[in-house]
Regions:
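Short, well-structured N-terminal submotif of metal-dependent ribonuclease cores
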Residues: 1-41, 53-65, 131
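Acidic, PIN/NYN-like endoribonuclease modules and their adjacent C-terminal/linker elements
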Residues: 1-2, 79, 107-139
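Phosphate- and divalent-cation-binding pockets in alpha/beta enzyme and binding domains
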Residues: 22, 45, 89, 126-127
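Alpha-helix capping/helix-boundary segments
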Residues: 9, 42, 85-86, 106, ...
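Long, hydrophilic "mature protein body" segments
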Residues: 5, 26-31, 73-74, 92-96, ...
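Active-site neighborhoods of divalent-metal-dependent phosphate/nucleic-acid chemistry enzymes
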Residues: 76-116, 120
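Active-site-proximal, substrate-binding regions of enzyme catalytic domains
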Residues: 47-77, 87-89
Length: 139
């Protein structure tokens, strides 16, 4: 099965003060035979979360470097959809499911790829279920 992961899950796995057993469980699974999909937005959110974590001394430089290695080891595939037609698609998903444009990027990708959605965001998870997308978190 393919999975779309959002940054709430990824950062909860990486930042010590945001640790989540659900994130730990998800990332402890063997994903070698699965696709992990992210919209290009994910990289900006990850960079911002880690940068702010370092700036606010939530993680050390060594932890930052270890996290980069851990994320790099995941079989992440970045979706490259962009352009005005994509903006329209995101707007439709955002409007239909009462999401921000950012959260719509994750749900739109899961819908388009027939993937599950792994998120710790309760609203995004509930809208994914409403859209017929399997969402593992939260329950």
């Amino acid at each position: 099965m393919a999975w779309v992961i959002d940054c709430s899950l990824a950062l909860a796995w990486g930042l010590p003060d945001e640790q989540s057993p659900k994130a730990d469980d998800f990332f402890s699974l063997d994903h070698s035979q699965q696709e992990i999909l992210v919209p290009s937005l994910w990289w900006f959110e990850l960079a911002n979360g880690l940068t702010m974590g370092r700036k606010r001394k939530r993680i050390t430089e060594d932890q930052f470097l270890r996290l980069l290695g851990a994320y790099d080891a995941l079989p992440i595939q970045t979706d490259s959809h962009s352009g005005f037609n994509f903006v329209q698609a995101l707007q439709r998903v955002a409007s239909q499911f009462e999401l921000s444009g950012y959260d719509a990027a994750y749900l739109e990708l899961a819908l388009r790829k027939g993937a599950g959605l792994a998120t710790l965001d309760k609203h995004l998870a509930s809208m994914a279920l409403r859209a017929g997308v399997f969402s593992v978190f939260p329950s």
